[in-house]
Amino acid sequence: MRKYLFAALALIGTGLVYAQKTLTPEDLWQIKRVSPIGITDKGDEVVYKVTTPNIEENSFDSELFVIPIKGGTPKKIEDYDQLIRNSKLSPDGKHELFHKSVHVNDVLGKDLYKDLEKSEVYIYEALDYRHWDTWNDGSYKHVFVKDVATGEEIDLLEGKPYYTPQEPFGGGEDYVWGPNGKSVYYVSKKLEGTEYATSTNTDIYKYDLASKTTTNITEDNKGYDTNPAFSSKGAMAWLQMKTEGYEADKNDIVVLENGVKQNLTAHWDETVSSFMWAKNAKDIYFIAPKNGTVQLFKVDYPRRTRKMPSIEQLTDGQFDVNGIVGEYNGGLIVTRTSMNQATELYRYDFKTKKLEQLTHENDAFYNSLDLPTVEKRMVKTRDGKDMLVWVILPPNFDSNKKYPTLLYAQGGPQSP
């Protein structure tokens, strides 16, 4: 897998007074955070959330909006229960998937020693005491199936010290309904202690509701297996890394249908960040790093033919396509950012093959600022390799003047 080294040269401004002001740390708290909810079931609108920092209350205020996919004025709404079907409901609507934390192991002193009822000390005898900033307090997130009519809940990992979703960053993408609603597919790393902490061997498991049995679908792969998703025809795709213990390995899209497994991106020298099945079940849209940015791609699914999957880059520019919200009749809704713009919703048109901005939550804020200029440069290293460098020039940059320079170099295998 190709590795990238990025360097950003940020040139600090002079503080001169201009018609517009330059960005300050305090200004950052005025930026509205746009988060997509999804395309409505009718397919003609997008629901999204706008979160604004509240400095006085030390909190965040959120509002919901709906906007036509063709463009227009956003409309504030109170909820979207009648607009978007809950994806965690079974196809027949009788059961619902959700996750919650369950106490499994005793870790606190007061749990291990009953005479120390006030002890909040954490006691560990092996690794897996913390992942990033998340401490293992003896509780594990488990997936549950809830009977909508009776409220009865089934813990798919009852009594087991395993996580689903995965800690610390996993979410609802770690568990989905099977196509017929009779089974649940979930991601879990069924290891404990030091073995859990040093392994990347997550697997995708199938839980059958009728027999209450569990089957490991990805037992043959010893690296990460994550993000299971089904096409409208019932084929399952997921993200897979081959090398056990190497959490920055190349991420591929693998498809399983009728017992036949195909790696759609094995021949492609890039790594996949996330993906979504096309409505036609013949293509998969995905996002991946490309030359210092993150772009939108499409790969076809040739099923069981000997044809090499064809990969097409759909977007290109000095911006990142961060996520795919959904497909509508004629295109995709995605989120996009750049070094001068926070997240906004964009519409990708299949015919024009262009991105068009859909939401404009921060336009007034940007228009009040003198923004920096961003330049992309490729520099030859001593060993003849190309190194990407982002040069960020301050607002009102004067090439005849000298400026203090800040060098920011980001390396390591996990840089995008």
Enumerate the language-model features and the residues they cover.
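Bacterial Sec-dependent N-terminal signal peptides
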Residues: 1-23
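Beta-strand-rich domains and repeat architectures in extracellular enzymes and scaffolds
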Residues: 26-60
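Conserved beta-strand position repeated once per blade in WD40 beta-propeller domains
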Residues: 36, 86, 174, 227, ...
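Residue-level detector of Asp-centered blade-edge/turn motifs that repeat once per structural unit
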Residues: 41-42, 91-92, 179-180, 231-233, ...
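Hydrophobic beta-strand positions that form the internal "hydrophobic ladder"
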Residues: 43-47, 96, 184, 234-237, ...
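A flexible loop/linker signature enriched in serine peptidases of the S9 family
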Residues: 50-63, 78-85, 99-142, 159-171, ...
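Short loop/turn segments that connect beta-strands within beta-propeller blades
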Residues: 68-72, 147-151, 208-212, 257-260, ...
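Serine-hydrolase catalytic core recognition
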Residues: 322-416
